[in-house]
Structure formats: C-alpha cells, structure tokens
C-alpha cells in the first residue's frame, strides 16, 4: 500500500515522541479515561505540521506526494486534499471564477454550499431547472435544451455549475453540455460529491472529470473509506481556470490547522481504490453489492424504485426503496431504524440507502422478516408526490443581490407568505438542497409542501420560527 502521508504519520507515532506542541491532548496523554480506549489509536496520529509531516497549505513533502498520487489515479492536472468537505471545494471553485456582479449559471437542485458560494462571490445567479423523474418524483439533471437556452441568453456567464450525480445516485452524460459550454468559453464546475468511486469504471457512471469538466469536487468520505469531511478537488488541464486563484481560495477557506487523520484517510482512500483496480477486486465487490440488494429485494412489503428516464444511469451504490403499503419515506425510515438499519435519507415517498464499496456487511433473514412485519402492522400515512421543480427552465431572482440586501425583513405566517419574497434559505436536510432560496418568490405550492414536511417532522434547516409556521421575508420597497 503506497500511502506516503499515512506512512509518515505511523513512523512518527512509533517514535513515542514527547509532545510539547498542539493539539492539547498531546498524543493522547491528556484525555478522559472513559473515552481514551476509543480515541487512543487515532490521537497518536492527530498531530500538527511537524518535521517530516509537511504542510497542506504549502505542500512540498509527503502531502504533496499523496496529492500527486490522487492526481495520477483520477487523471487530473492537479488534485487537492480538502479537510472541510466538498463544501469548501464548492466555495473555492465558484469564488475562483466569479467577481461581484458577474453572471453564473447554476443548476437549481445543487447543494446549499453552491448557493452560499454564489452569494459570497457577489455574482448574480441564473437558475437552471432540472427534470423531475416521473417514477421517483425527484429532480435529476438539467436537460441539454435548457443549457443551450441559458448559454444563448447569457453568453458572458463566468461559469456553469452542475451537480452530477444527484444524492440519489442519478447520473447523466454531460459530454454535450460541457462541449456546448466550452464553445462559449465558459468553464464547467461540477459537484461530484457522490462520485469519488466512478474512477472504477463500469457499471459505475462516468466521472465528469473524464467528460471534460474543468473542476470536479468529490466527497471521498461519502462512498470511499475516508473520514467525514475528507474530499478531493480535481483540476482538469484547462485554460478556462486560474489554478492559482483556486489554490488561493483553498488556503483562505480551509482550516489553518488541517486534520492529519482526515488527510491520512484521503491517502488511504485513494490507495483503496487503486488496490481494487490493480488487484481486480471489483467483480467481488459488485457481487457483495448485488447480494445486499437481493436481501432488500426479498422484502414483500417494500420495493426498489428506479428512474423512469432511460438516459439516467443509477450508481450501483445507491438503493432507493418504497413501501408497498402506502407509507411515506419518513415512516419507512423509522421502521428500518427500529430494526437497527440506519439509512442515508428519507423523503415524502421513499428511503435512500448508501451501500458499501466492499466490506462484509450482511443482513440476515430474521431482520428482513421483522421489517416486513413492522411495515404490515404500521398504519399507512398518505404519500405526496413532489410537484414540478419550477415553471420556467431558466430563471433569475426578482431583484439583484445588492438590492435584496437593502431591504428590511419581517416574519409572516405561512398563510401570508405566498407571493412574498423569501429572506432565508429553507433547506430540508438531508439532502441539503434549498427548497426555497433567499430572494425567491414564495409560492402557494412551496408553502403547502413545507407545511407537509414539518407535519412529518422532517429536519428543515432555517430559523426556529419555521416550526411555528412563520417565514422570514423581505419588505419590498412598494410594501414598506
């Protein structure tokens, strides 16, 4: 296993050195005894920028070597380790291409970090509505026709931001879209958080990096054996991206005390993927994935659901199941949790499971029987099919950001909110996609959906008054 950073950390730990440096646990010497047995092995490599351990913000040794190995594996011009998750990668890539007042094209069902980056940049977003799959009732990809319409209307846009795959593992062929954007000289920035394993090839979807995207950010911690917050940012060889600006923003936005355990896990995750490829382990892993899927397929009161659109490729690591007995996804998720099966997310209709890329996890027949019995005896609750994701394929906010920020705000009841201008992001989490964004006009349908989600006890990020059925709205000039 060629893991230069991890190896250097282990070598340092074996020296049994005397720590007179941060962090304050001093190699685990200062720690609660009750927790020490759990944390102890990790604390020995939770160090700082010591001799031989390099510096993430100016790599010249083992971190540089580890990043270069990741770049070689993924075929990028350069790869960066991220210790603040794909969130920091999304922030850096968008800030690197935008200035205040610039136009940027953004897929509407992106993660909240994308919209936060746009807001911080001062750019004016143009939102691109995705298709909604008729079988799963979730947003998928932005169709080529919508992309072309946006490019023709905004040929001077500074970037096109896409999410591929979606949280549900739905991936589209972006080749034509990327080619079209490049025809206008517009860089394509892709949040590929759920696709760090796509480098393994079929039957997994193709990575946006291979399809020619200019910057791709991946959450290694989502599908690879990396610690939470460990991600990669990949730069393609491109004249459309200023590499130094990307690096500068990563230096500004990432912690000045990056976690060595997280960085080491990124080194190990890359080596794990490389091992699968070099040792031809993929067929065995796929068989284990299929066995797990067959286990859930044996449920008589639930079923797997897949997109109706034949152009959508579903990641084999994602499994979406739905009750056959009229339960919402939230109720089905609770039933699974009572059987000690904890899933990634639920929505109004279904539950999403993220399957492991390897491992030995098995679910026995007794657990499946208990789940079936629970589904059968749990009273059904009405399921709601999501409406379309927007009336127009290409939209802009009613007011520029500068004008919005000049408006005062007030709280109004849900009943009064329709037609008003929303003043904060309303985000069901997970998946972290804003349902209503600050600056968007609130519709009657969105208020109704938010009411349903709250009644289902869905976790919604926003101010605490949402639970009291109040929304923060802007006071527009004509209403002040």
UniProtKB/Swiss-Prot annotation:
Alphabetical UniProt keywords: Decarboxylase, Lyase, Pyridoxal phosphate
Cofactor section: pyridoxal 5'-phosphate
Membrane spanning stretches: none
Sample GO molecular function, one term: carboxy-lyase activity
Protein's UniProt keywords contain Kinase: no
Modified residues (N6-(pyridoxal phosphate)lysine): 222
InterPro entries xrefs: Orn/Lys/Arg_deCO2ase_major_dom (IPR000310), Orn_Lys_Arg_decarboxylase-I (IPR052357), Prn/Lys/Arg_de-COase_C (IPR008286), Prn/Lys/Arg_de-COase_C_sf (IPR036633), PyrdxlP-dep_Trfase (IPR015424), PyrdxlP-dep_Trfase_major (IPR015421)
Keyword Lyase: yes
Pfam family name, one: OKR_DC_1_C
Gene3D superfamilies assigned: Molybdopterin biosynthesis moea protein, domain 2, Type I PLP-dependent aspartate aminotransferase-like (Major domain)
Similarity comment text for this entry: Belongs to the Orn/Lys/Arg decarboxylase class-I family.
Name assigned to this protein: Uncharacterized protein YaaO
Origin species: Bacillus subtilis (strain 168)
